[in-house]
Structures are given as C-alpha cells and as structure tokens.
UniProtKB/Swiss-Prot annotation:
UniProt record similarity statement: Belongs to the LpxK family.
Organism domain of life: Bacteria
Protein name: Tetraacyldisaccharide 4'-kinase
Pfam families assigned to the protein according to its UniProt record, in alphabetical order: LpxK (PF02606)
UniProt keyword Nucleotide-binding present: yes
Record-linked InterPro entries: LpxK, P-loop_NTPase
Length: 332
C-alpha cells in the first residue's frame, strides 16, 4: 500500500487495528516461548529465510543463493515452503520443476527448477519436513518464509529487506507493512538488504540479470540485443523489474503490474504484447511456459551478496555458524 511509505492520515485511522494486531501476535509469540503452545523441533538444522514486512523484498533469490552455497559446501539441502498460490487438493506435496505452478506454487517450482533441491510444500511445516526427510537425504533444511511461523523451531533466521523501502512507516499491519515491530531484527541472525545498504544491513544483495530466455524455444539472447518491448510482472514489487529493464537500455512501450502470485491466461498477455517482445520475471515464466508465444522472454537474475561494510566478517561468521550447527546435529 502506498500510504505505508508516506505520512498519510490513513495511518492514524488504522493505528488502533495495528495495536490489536500487535497485541494478538505478541500474545501468540509469548505462548510459544513459554511452551503453552507446542512447537516442532526438526531432526535436522532449520534455516528460516523470511521478511519482516509484506511485499516483494527479494526472498526467493536469497533462498536460491543460499541453497546453492550450501550445496557448494558439500551439504545435502532440502527446502520447505507454505506454497503461496498453490491450489493443491492434498498436502504435503513434493514439488519438482515439472509440477504445475497452480498446484506447487510459483516460487517453490522456481526454487526446484533453479536448485534441483528437493522441495516440499504444506501449510503444516512439520508435515512438510516429515515428508521431505522420508524421501530425501538432507543435512540441513531451508524454510522459504516462515519467520512468524513459531510452530516451527529454527536454528538460524535470515531477514530479507528492500533497502529503499526498508521498514516503511514502522507500523505493523494494517497501518503499516510490518508483520512484527522493528525490534524483532535484534533477535535474527542475519539481515540482507536488497538493492543497497541501510542501517540494518549485514550484507547487501544485488540482483544481476545476464540474458533473456525465450519461453517457447529456450533460446538465450543478450539483453543488449533488445531495444524496446513490453513488460509484465506479478511479483511483490513490479516496479523494481521494470526499472531494471530500463537501466539495461530497453525502452518499455508498456508495463503491466499484476498482483503477486497471479495466475495468468494466454489472452491476458497476448493483448499486451501484440508484435513486440514481452518480458517477464522467471517467477512469472513458470506459470506461462505452457501457453507461451514466440515473442515472450523471461529474465532470470542471480543474487550477488556482499558484505555491507569493507573489512566486515559477517558472512564468514554466518558460514561458521552453519558448520557448527551441522556438526552439532550430526554428533547428536
């Protein structure tokens, strides 16, 4: 919501509801901390990758980056997710790159495609982990989202934040974009800011595009080969994608933002594209591949994550924590 990032009077009208939201969430958290509500401890270490605020912060590229980095270190990695956008009739569901996005959810299918890691979705994270471990050998589990899912105990927490929007007006829902107060950041292990550095950054992520891939033929082209086109995005922050294309020198004749996890139909996009190249995110492409036209292209991005400050040791310390965690679980 635009007013989350301004001084709109709506903030004060909605603030009583935010107070109620905060009280309920604090009570719920306290019940888990006191052991009054039960939580699940997985037999393998769990890393949560989540957000403090709603809206596109760049969480999925961080999950992909983290899984790939863990695999480079010789670890067998499994991924669990709630599976937002999934309309599967049964859960938990084992997701592969060939799972239909309407069943597996666009982000889990994308993660499975990019990492080849085993992925299981379920609103019940315990059931997701149990199915995952029954079908795959894992040394460590990455939870895509779930920072506020206190029914699942965790060993490490990573928060991904948009560097520019940060925490918005600082209010929790519905007056602001936050699911928890900013003070929650003091208890997480690592904060990655997307697109630049701010006061909360332990590390900075830049999303780097290298080429465009045709949805129908899988042909790869350098982005500099395109002069103009049309762009669509069904992600949390569509403008970030449009701005990226324009910075690469592509003149966008038209842009269309859709809601996050939008399920597309061919007719929607054919009208937009006409005879021009149509650009979309990789997350949207997994939902459009089955009915793509010849002039539809997606732009995959890779997360490049660097220290927030020169001479900083946050990343080495982070990997040290993971090594110790895995060793601890292996040794019982």
């Amino acid at each position: 919501m635009p007013f989350w990032y301004s001084n709109s009077k709506l903030i004060w009208l909605l603030s009583p509801f935010s107070l109620l939201f905060w009280l309920i969430s604090q009570l719920r958290h306290a019940l888990f901390c006191l052991g009054i509500k039960s939580s699940y401890r997985a037999p393998k270490p769990v890393i949560i990758v989540g957000n403090l605020s709603v809206g596109g912060n760049g969480k999925t590229p961080v999950v992909v980056w983290l899984v790939e980095e863990l695999k480079k270190r010789g670890l067998r990695v499994g991924v669990i997710s709630r599976g937002y956008g999934s309309k599967s009739k049964t859960y938990p569901l084992f997701v592969t790159e060939n799972t239909r996005p309407i069943e597996g959810g666009d982000e889990p299918v994308l993660i499975a495609k990019r990492t080849n890691a085993p992925v299981v979705i379920s609103p019940n994270r315990q059931q997701a982990i149990e199915l995952l471990l029954s079908q795959a050998e894992c040394d460590i589990i990455v939870s895509d989202d779930g920072l506020q899912h206190y029914k699942l105990q965790r060993d490490l927490e990573i928060v991904v934040m948009d560097a520019e929007r940060a925490l918005g007006n600082g209010f929790v829902l519905p007056a602001g974009p936050l699911r928890e107060l900013p003070s929650r950041l003091k208890s997480v292990d690592f904060v990655i800011t997307n697109g630049g550095k701010n006061q909360y950054s332990d590390a900075v992520m830049y999303l780097v595009p290298h080429f465009a891939i045709n949805l129908k033929t899988n042909e790869k082209r350098q982005l500099k080969e395109f002069q103009s086109g049309v762009a669509i995005a069904g992600i949390g922050n569509p403008q970030r994608f449009f701005t990226m294309l324009e910075k690469l020198g592509i003149q966008l004749e038209r842009t269309q933002a859709f809601q996050d996890h939008q399920h597309f139909e061919a007719s929607q996009l054919e009208k937009l594209a006409e005879n021009q190249p149509l650009f979309m995110t990789e997350k949207d492409a997994v939902k459009c591949q089955s009915f793509a036209n010849d002039n539809w292209w997606y732009v995959p991005v890779d997360a490049e994550i660097i220290e927030a400050e020169k001479q900083c040791e946050n990343l080495p310390h982070f990997w040290d924590k993971i090594d110790k965690l895995v060793a601890q679980y292996r040794n019982g």
